[in-house]
Amino acid sequence: ATGRRVVGPAGAVRIRSDAKWSVPEPELTLFVNPLGAIVGYTVGNDMSSRDIEGENPLYLPQAKVYDGSCSIGPRIAVNIGDDGPRAIEMTITRGGSKMFEGQTSTAQMRRTEEELAEFLFREMSFNDGVFLLTGTGIVPPDDFTLASRDIVSISIEGIGTLENPV
């Protein structure tokens, strides 16, 4: 998503009005400087309209990029280096009740953080640097969809917790 479509901690993420199946996607997020070097880490939530995405692969941009489709925060952690795998946890609450909870680890990533950054910078430049969301390992089950006023909480070990209302 572009910067104007991203919200920070406590900012409201959105579900598309024309979507029937929307889910959050918790992702380790890298901050990469203009030279392609990873200089920081944060938490990301890459919202997805699964029903729109599933209709046709060409609809992926509409399913993933819209106002309020991404949140990033709560901070940029620097100098954490390669401390090994990090636990990632997501909880979704509705009306004070836990509706979904899932866990994974950065150990499940198929490519290294450096490989992802290198691939992004092969044919693109970012004068101010870029936040790179690395992909999700937690997706709620097919019978779950987000609702207005849900609270999405994503924690990554050593970085912090990002919480957003829907």
Task: Show the residue positions of the predicted features.
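Generic recognition of flexible, low-complexity loop/linker segments
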Residues: 17-18, 141-143
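Short, basic/aromatic beta-hairpin or loop at an interaction surface
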Residues: 103-112, 120-133
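Short alpha-helix capping/helix-loop boundary micro-motifs
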Residues: 116-121, 137-142
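Conserved metal-binding segment of the jelly-roll/cupin
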Residues: 126-140, 154-157
